[in-house]
Every structure is written in C-alpha cells, then in structure tokens.
Amino acid sequence: MRYKVGMYGGAFDPLHIGHIDLIIKAASQCEKLYVVLSYSRNRDNIPMEYRYRWIRNSFKHMDNIEIILLEDNAYNKSDYD
C-alpha cells in the first residue's frame, strides 16, 4: 500500500542510523513524507541549523521528503504538566 502523505518527527539530537533507516522506509511508502524537526533553543545539545543540514543533505536525493521545523518553547518537561 502506498500512502499519499506520511510524517516522521523527532529532535534528531543527534541524527543517527536508526532515524535514517526509518525515514527511508517511511518515504518508500508515501508519495510525500514530512520530516518534522523539533527544536528548542533552550535545551538542544546540537544547534538546529546543524541538524537541519544533516537531514537535508542525507535525503537530498529523495524528492518526496520535505523538512518542517517545529519550535518547542517549553523550558523543561515540567512545563507540560
């Protein structure tokens, strides 16, 4: 079965082979895959710009992948309680 749209999200802090494998598998099952990169300027270990470039460069040969940025403004997990 081929889906019209798929979504795979994460902080990718850092991007690793498990993420890459799952994104490739998801993209092969979708006409369009949105990879949602969540980031927080307060908590991230690796700057969002680096992680964005890693994802972009890792999948630039796959035309059906689009990267979306999603900022998380909470300072820590207790802000969600």
Regions found by a protein language model. Give the residues of each.
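Nucleotidyltransferase catalytic core that binds NTPs
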Residues: 1-81
